[in-house]
């Protein structure tokens, strides 16, 4: 694919080379584009990632309003509709997910590509309240202090979160460099432990299970 060939080694290193429809590449800026697609494959938002450091932010997220402004295309939307669409365009996979069954919320779009029926956020620094009233929502945020603190907030409210510590101990992975689902997928690709088959067993909404996060 001529739009992604320069970024192919990076995508392959993260086992994303079979999902090229979600990516583009800007050879001038040396930026990878991660697309938020609807069910028809139309772009409703995107995130860029620097493949060569320039000293600026590694990730930049573009909502639909910003895209239209850059292209100088009038959107002809009311302020209310524009606010709603901008919100949707920052939730990767939101237009492809079935909330009638369990769906998983990740910190970013890359991890969400490795699990069916998932949504990718654009980080967890802001409050995540959009899914608080949806009983089928569950959180698999990063295995770091920021992600775990956010999941502690959620499990205290009775929402399902992934118990990283319990999972990693069970499969002898404590001490491995596994920060997120993509890291886990890469580890499993090399080592074939079978651990991915049992991920569902390590979600809990019991506040007493906070010690296993």
Language-model features and meaning:
Residues 30-136, 150-151:
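Phosphate-handling DNA/RNA-contact segment within nucleic-acid enzymes
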Residues 1-44, 68, 75, 79-81, ...:
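TOPRIM metal-binding catalytic domain and adjacent DNA-binding surface shared by DnaG-type primases
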Residues 4-6, 19-21, 55-64, 88, ...:
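A general marker of short, structured functional hotspots
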Residues 39, 44, 100-103, 109-213:
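TOPRIM fold recognition
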Residues 2, 10, 28, 50, ...:
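Broad hydrophobic/π-residue packing in well-ordered secondary structure
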């Amino acid at each position: 694919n001529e739009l992604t060939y320069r970024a192919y080694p990076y995508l392959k290193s993260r086992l994303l080379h079979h999902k090229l429809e979600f990516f583009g590449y800007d050879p001038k800026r040396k930026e990878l584009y991660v697309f938020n697609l609807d069910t028809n494959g139309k772009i409703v938002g995107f995130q860029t990632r620097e493949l060569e450091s320039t000293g600026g932010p590694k990730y930049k997220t573009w909502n639909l309003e910003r895209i239209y402004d850059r292209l100088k295309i009038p959107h002809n939307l009311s302020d209310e509709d524009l606010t709603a669409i901008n919100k949707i365009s920052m939730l990767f996979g939101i237009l492809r997910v079935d909330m009638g069954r369990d769906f998983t919320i990740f910190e970013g779009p890359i991890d969400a590509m490795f699990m069916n029926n998932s949504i990718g956020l654009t980080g967890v620094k802001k409050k995540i309240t959009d899914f608080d009233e949806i009983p089928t929502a569950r959180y698999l945020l990063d295995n770091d202090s920021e992600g775990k603190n956010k999941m502690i907030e959620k499990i205290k409210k009775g929402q399902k979160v992934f118990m990283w510590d319990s999972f990693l101990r069970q499969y002898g992975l404590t001490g491995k460099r596994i920060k997120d689902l993509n890291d886990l997928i890469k580890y499993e690709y090399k080592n074939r432990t079978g651990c991915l088959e049992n991920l569902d067993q390590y979600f809990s909404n019991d506040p007493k299970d906070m010690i296993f996060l």
